[in-house]
UniProtKB/Swiss-Prot annotation:
Family to which this protein belongs: Belongs to the MAJIN family.
Subunit-structure text: Component of the MAJIN-TERB1-TERB2 complex, composed of MAJIN, TERB1 and TERB2.
Disulfide bonds: none
Gene this protein is translated from: Majin
Gene Ontology cellular component terms for the protein in this record: chromosome, telomeric region; nuclear envelope; nuclear inner membrane
The protein's name: Membrane-anchored junction protein
Perinuclear space domain ranges by topology: 247-251
Protein origin, superkingdom: Eukaryota
Residues in the Nuclear compartment per record: 1-227
Alphabetic keyword roster: Chromosome, DNA-binding, Meiosis, Membrane, Nucleus, Telomere, Transmembrane, Transmembrane helix
UniProt topology in membrane: Single-pass membrane protein
């Protein structure tokens, strides 16, 4: 498969066919790419062709790989509206591959200079600092995620859960204590012998069991009077006793 020269270092989109299949490639270059770095352009073309062949040979398991001068990051995405396209090579109808391959290319020296943090002439200082800050942020995030798992330093989420559980258990214990206290006071104080007095606590807003007042000693009650006769007979009996009428009749 012979390829036309690439537009390095400018991005481009190429349609390549192998057999009866058509493949769409997007080639994108990173900020570390400079056109004047490599004088022999034939070397660049050969490395790009080898990169495309490597991608076609490993379409189902794409992984980053390294050439003599570049680091290639291959990606695969869906080819939109590919069913509406038709390709022919002479009289042969070609079948388009339903995915698009995108190659992100960086200079090999770019990755080698990142661990030391020292920028080279090919890499701007701002780019190196940005990469180092991203790495430090990742390390801090990983450290924060690992800290809650240690028993000595529980994370904020775990501490919040423990505080809520302790508060709920304390509230439940207070309710049980109040219930048992009320039952004991009811058992110790019969309703027929004494009277229970409850006071209202203005701060807590609930009734508290009060003091128990001993029963009062009552003297013997006076005998009940017979109900007086009512009506006209009662009025007559009040004026003239009955024995007066019986005495008159006997005479």
């Amino acid at each position: 498969m012979s390829l036309k020269p690439f537009t390095y270092p400018f991005p481009e989109t190429r349609f390549l066919h192998a057999g009866t299949n058509v493949y769409k490639f997007k080639i994108r270059y990173g900020n570390s790419i400079r056109g004047e770095e490599i004088e022999d352009k034939g070397v660049i073309i050969q490395e790009l062709e080898d990169s495309i062949r490597a991608v076609l040979a490993n379409m189902d398991s794409l992984q980053p790989f390294v050439t003599e001068h570049f680091i290639v990051f291959p990606y695969k995405s869906k080819w939109e509206r590919v069913s509406h396209l038709k390709f022919k090579h002479g009289e042969i109808i070609l079948t388009p591959y339903p995915f698009v391959f995108t190659l992100y290319i960086e200079m090999k020296c770019f990755a080698e200079s990142l661990p030391s943090g020292k920028p080279t002439d090919d890499i701007p200082l701002e780019l190196v600092l940005t990469a180092k800050e991203a790495e430090e942020a990742t390390m801090r995030k990983r450290k924060l995620m690992e800290e809650p798992s240690t028993p000595s330093r529980p994370g904020p989420h775990r501490a919040k859960m423990e505080t809520w559980s302790e508060a709920s258990s304390t509230k439940k214990a207070l309710k049980e204590h109040k219930r048992s206290w009320g039952e004991d006071s009811q058992q110790d104080t019969p309703a027929s012998d004494s009277t229970a007095v409850t006071e209202q606590d203005p701060m807590l807003g609930h009734s508290l069991p009060g003091l128990v007042v001993p029963p009062l000693e009552h003297s013997n009650p006076p005998p009940l009077k017979e109900p007086a006769a009512r009506g006209f007979l009662g009025f007559l009996s009040a004026l003239f006793p009955f024995r007066y009428f019986f005495r008159k009749s006997t005479q």
